[in-house]
A protein has these predicted regions:
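C-terminal-most transmembrane helix of multi-pass membrane proteins
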Residues: 37-38, 138, 211-213, 247-316
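Specific alpha-helical transmembrane segments that line the substrate/conduction pathway
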Residues: 31-42, 74, 79, 83-117, ...
Length: 316
């Protein structure tokens, strides 16, 4: 995987936690999410109508429905829980920590669902990464005051929603143009968030420059950057590698928080960052490049003589 894409993905994805906190100071989570996706969906739909009709010709009703479901899980389900957790008082670092356990869940399910088996060295890397993200926010949950224990389950539900979307995309029988996918996902989220905000009476945006700054931040960095690069890296490198990068989200989010909000950045955060980097190195070195890398030897990936990686789509 291109190292530059990996760095950009980590920076842009982690910026979403900061954008959520920026927006939370001016409006309810549903208001922020509605205005994050409404203008974006309109712009993408207009661009598709004017310049991208050819991209949509091969998209059947079944593939369209699948992309709607992926968008609902990966954007609406995931983002709503992240924003609600931060709104309930869970820190950005702890929210990123819970998000950082995603690679372990993906690794456990990748074999039975996709035929992508995790090597012994990769398991060590995954465990090292979990240790890193736990160290980053050690004591945060116990030191936080006024936050209910169940609030920490909210981002966990969002993480599972993103995992479900990832596997649904990876098991898709046909490839969908990335621009088409992005448009469908954003339009789906715009409709769902607007409907939820209307029911809650939270559609109207506040007339403040800081609100629109947070919206611009979320559209440019988090949606086009983080979300778009997530699917690009997934297609290029597979679920294990893209999710290994999630180990870096908690420490990088902590760096964002220190720079943007003056949140403390101490020795534990630095140690967690180093462990996360070590985890990514272990996972990447133990896995062949590419999404459908063919077969892998016994000592690298599995006790079986050979394991064919990927679903029918991944092997194409």
């Amino acid at each position: 995987m291109n190292a530059l894409l990996a760095v950009l993905f980590v920076l842009c994805w982690s910026s979403g936690f900061i954008g959520a906190k920026l927006g939370a100071g001016d409006a309810a989570p549903l208001t922020v999410l509605t205005w994050r996706f409404l203008p974006l969906a309109v712009a993408l739909a207009l661009a598709a109508a004017l310049f991208g009709r050819a991209r949509w010709r091969g998209l059947g009703s079944r593939a369209f429905g699948r992309q709607v479901t992926i968008g609902a899980l990966s954007q609406t389900g995931y983002l709503l829980t992240v924003y609600q957790a931060i709104g309930l008082g869970v820190s950005t670092g702890t929210t990123a920590l819970i998000d950082g356990t995603q690679p372990l869940v993906v690794a456990a399910l990748a074999g039975p669902l996709l035929g992508q088996y995790v090597a012994p060295r990769q398991w060590w890397g995954l465990l090292l990464g979990v240790a890193g993200v736990m160290i980053v926010t050690a004591g945060d949950a116990t030191s936080a005051s006024g936050v209910s224990w169940w609030a920490y389950l909210v981002p966990f539900a969002g993480m599972l929603s993103l995992v479900a979307a990832t596997f649904l995309e990876s098991r898709s029988p046909t490839d969908t143009d990335p621009v088409v996918s992005m448009t469908v996902h954003c339009a789906t989220s715009a409709v769902l968030f607007t409907a939820l905000a209307a029911c809650a009476g939270q559609v109207s945006p506040p007339p403040t420059a800081s609100f629109w700054w947070s919206v611009a931040w979320l559209i440019a960095l988090s949606t086009f950057g983080g979300y778009g690069l997530y699917w690009l890296v997934l297609r290029r490198s597979g679920v294990t590698r893209v999710n290994a990068l999630m180990f870096l989200m908690a420490p990088v989010t902590a760096i964002w928080g220190a720079v943007m909000f003056g949140e403390p950045f101490g020795i534990l955060t630095a140690l967690g960052l180093l462990l996360g980097l070590g985890a990514v190195v272990l996972v990447f070195r133990a896995q062949p490049r590419g999404r459908g890398a063919g077969t892998v030897p016994t000592d690298e990936q599995s006790p079986e003589p050979e394991v064919v990686r990927g679903s029918a789509r991944l092997r194409r």
